[in-house]
């Protein structure tokens, strides 16, 4: 009412630009239009709440100086993403022309993305196809789920590469790129990714009967998911 004094504490302004940082990168291929980088586990792809530095974008700006601007100030050059704890291949656009070409391929599901995943348990079959819509979890907004009413179609194809009795190494191809898709689908399959603290993998370690295997799994400081192959058509050449 009239005469009241109102004090307002405003949150600190978010930075409007990303500062280049001299962070080592493993560049597997680079030309004038794009580059392919092997992102390490534990690195966030681009700045967001709680992660204003130390991201892949910070490192890329130091390495390249200039990237495609289509993704905006905080996501220059970023055409697709990997989860923080997932390692592996990412293609980055250095020019707007390359960005548009690559983004179109991802939108049309023309890019072939293959992962390796170490999962708990010994699958009963040598492979399979999972077709379950993935969307935001109905009660936990930080998780994804196949029980969401607003889920989007998602397809995951997997096959066993090696069996270790208490675990298995899978080769996983995704025909869609939904958030946490592989982790959610493999958990629904009954074989969560080793080291995945969100979708049941961390608690599953208590069921591993082999002490040596359990110790090795417990020593992992990340989820055992790696993007090891990425096939696309060069957007320029």
Regions found by a protein language model. Name each.
Residues 1-237:
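RNA pseudouridine synthases
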């Amino acid at each position: 009412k009239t005469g009241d004094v109102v004090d307002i504490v405003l949150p600190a302004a978010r930075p409007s630009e990303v500062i280049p940082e001299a962070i080592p990168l493993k560049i597997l291929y680079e030309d004038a239009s794009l580059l392919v980088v092997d992102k390490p586990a534990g690195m966030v792809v681009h700045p967001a709440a709680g992660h204003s530095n130390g991201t892949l974008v910070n490192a890329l700006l130091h390495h390249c100086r200039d990237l495609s601007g289509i993704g905006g100030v905080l996501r220059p050059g970023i055409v697709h993403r990997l989860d923080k704890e997932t390692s592996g291949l990412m293609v980055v656009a250095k020019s707007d022309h390359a960005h548009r070409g690559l983004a179109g391929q991802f939108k049309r599901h023309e890019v072939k993305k293959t992962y390796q995943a170490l999962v708990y348990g010994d699958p009963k079959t040598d492979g399979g196809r999972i077709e379950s819509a993935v969307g935001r979890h109905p009660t936990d907004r930080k998780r994804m789920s196949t029980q969401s009413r607003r889920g989007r179609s998602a397809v995951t194809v997997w096959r066993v590469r090696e069996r270790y009795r208490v675990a298995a190494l899978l080769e996983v191809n995704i025909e869609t790129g939904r958030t946490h898709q592989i982790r959610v689908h493999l958990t629904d399959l009954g074989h969560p990714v080793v080291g995945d603290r969100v979708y049941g993998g961390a608690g599953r370690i208590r069921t591993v009967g082999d002490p040596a295997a359990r110790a090795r799994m417990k020593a992992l400081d990340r989820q055992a998911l790696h993007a090891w192959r990425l096939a696309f058509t060069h957007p320029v050449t």
